[in-house]
Amino acid sequence: MGNKSKAYKAAAEKIDKGRLYTPLKAAELVKETSSKNCDATVDVAIRLGVDPRKADQLVRGTVSLPNGTGKSVRVAVFAEGEKATEAQAAGADIVGTTELIEQITAGTIEFDVAIATPDQMAKVGRVARVLGPRGLMPNPKTGTVTNDVAKAIAEVKGGKISFRVDKASNLHAIIGKASFDAEKLAENYGALLDEINRIKPSSAKGIYVKKVTLTSTFGPGVPVDPSIQKNYTQA
């Protein structure tokens, strides 16, 4: 633990907390200060000027990151018959409905994304209390309730992520791995921020993107200038 603390402290000293970095410089610092023991995941935390208690200010959506997440995504698909066959052919990791629901209820299965065909949603509703709090409930708004299961699987495995503002007006998302080039991390961040800006609620007042922090697993946070909303790969 002591070594970790020393390593973290040394990494944190490289970051000027009183400065707001460009997305590219922040990505470079995240890479430089990430753990050397693993290929750390790079996350972004964004504070939005919205009131998520108001339905029209609940910011949520999806975006396909141009460079993917670098993460192997385990996909479960609720489907039967022909659609189940399509899902298996498209590379789904788990396919089924009744047995899958039983495994979810028993807590014996893990996956990162759930997709369902519309005709299976009544059954999926039985495990909504388990999937909902974990952000795994299929939803038409995120493209995870669909008859085109092959397309949905390809998008998710290719780097499509979902995001949603929480009760404290914060939004968290994975934008890659520490092994990515800094430019690729900045491009992924830019794609996410562009989509967040595109779906800005019309009722949101004042500054919309208030605070941005990039961080790697076990690494210190790097403050990003939230006013930079284009030319993300410029130093």
From Swiss-Prot:
One example of a Gene Ontology biological process annotation: regulation of translation
Pfam families named among the record's database cross-references: Ribosomal_L1 (PF00687)
InterPro entries: Ribosom_uL1_bac-type (IPR005878), Ribosomal_uL1 (IPR002143), Ribosomal_uL1-like (IPR023674), Ribosomal_uL1/biogenesis (IPR028364), Ribosomal_uL1_3-a/b-sand (IPR016095), Ribosomal_uL1_CS (IPR023673)
Keywords carried by this UniProt record: Repressor, Ribonucleoprotein, Ribosomal protein, RNA-binding, rRNA-binding, Translation regulation, tRNA-binding
Entry's Gene Ontology cellular component terms: large ribosomal subunit
GO molecular function: rRNA binding; structural constituent of ribosome; tRNA binding
NCBIfam families in the cross-refs: rplA_bact
Family in the record: Belongs to the universal ribosomal protein uL1 family.
HAMAP family assigned: Ribosomal_uL1_B (MF_01318_B)
Subunit details: Part of the 50S ribosomal subunit.
Cross-referenced PANTHER family: 54S RIBOSOMAL PROTEIN L1, MITOCHONDRIAL, LARGE RIBOSOMAL SUBUNIT PROTEIN UL1M
Function: Binds directly to 23S rRNA. The L1 stalk is quite mobile in the ribosome, and is involved in E site tRNA release.
Protein name, UniProt field: Large ribosomal subunit protein uL1
Taxonomic classification: Bacteria, Bacillati, Actinomycetota, Actinomycetes, Mycobacteriales
Gene: rplA
